[in-house]
Swiss-Prot record:
Binding sites annotated in the UniProt record for Mg(2+): 18, 56, 117
Organism of provenance: Xylella fastidiosa (strain Temecula1 / ATCC 700964)
Record's protein name: ATP-dependent dethiobiotin synthetase BioD
Record-stated family: Belongs to the dethiobiotin synthetase family.
Pathway the protein takes part in: Cofactor biosynthesis; biotin biosynthesis; biotin from 7,8-diaminononanoate: step 1/2
Lineage start: Bacteria, Pseudomonadati, Pseudomonadota, Gammaproteobacteria, Lysobacterales
Pfam families: AAA_26
Length: 226
């Protein structure tokens, strides 16, 4: 199954969107596709001799082949480690749709697939006038949902899926990522999620200790049709 561009969102912040996106990039590359990542808006950046840099965006850059310029991967790098809308206000920056679309177009010219990682959960806005649904519509790409497996994941997963669909967008798959290694009844919860979510299931990632190379997990994810 040959995939094209898609947007990775999650049921919350801190549920592994970046790590899953890196795994997906390695999976695509393993299939012979040129795949690059994009983090349109990132907060919590640190300053270096090359400018403001975000850890998640750097991870996406490292997982990409070819390797795009950082400014294309992360057009808006915001210092404060808070919600992007607040971070942009503090930085005196207005997040605009046009630069994001332009960067995506340039990345698309370099690769077969662009994996675009969102911010926080699906309903997290990008500025006062548009949210992630607005960006996804502008890019004309579908959505992949990362479900963080922990207590409350059923509610979060169903609400996120319903919100994506209510926005009129296509959700082509969901991935279960174990956040809490001590979560009770993981398999039972996973089975219920597979029954209740009306979108294709792409696979389950166990709890991953820090330092694991995402390339080693590329075979664990299986988009529908594999």
């Amino acid at each position: 199954m040959s995939l094209s561009d898609f947007y990775v969102t999650g049921t919350d912040t801190g549920i592994g969107k970046t790590f899953v996106s890196c795994i997906l990039l390695h999976m695509l590359r393993g299939r012979g596709q040129r795949a690059v990542g994009m983090k349109p808006v990132a907060s919590g950046c640190t300053y270096s001799d090359t400018g403001w840099r975000n850890e998640d965006a750097l991870a996406l850059q490292a997982a990409s082949d070819p390797t795009p310029a950082y400014d294309l991967i992360n057009p808006y790098a915001l210092p404060a480690a808070v919600a992007p809308e607040i971070a942009a206000i503090e930085a005196g920056v207005t997040v605009a749709l046009e630069p994001l679309s332009a960067s995506f177009t340039q990345l698309r010219a370099q690769a077969d697939v662009v994996v675009v990682e969102g911010v926080g959960g699906w309903a997290t806005p990008l500025n006062a006038t548009f949210d992630q649904a607005t960006l996804v519509r502008a890019l004309e790409i579908p959505v992949v949902l990362v479900v963080g497996l922990r207590l409350g994941c059923m509610n979060h997963a169903r609400l996120s899926t319903a919100a994506i669909m209510a926005d009129g967008l296509r959700c082509i798959g969901w991935i279960a990522n174990t956040i809490d290694p001590h979560m009770a009844r993981i398999e039972e919860n996973l089975a219920l999620l597979r029954q209740r979510l009306p979108i294709p299931y792409w696979g389950h990632l166990p709890h991953i200790p820090p330092g694991i190379n995402p390339a080693t997990l590329a075979t664990r994810l299986h988009p529908q049709g594999d």
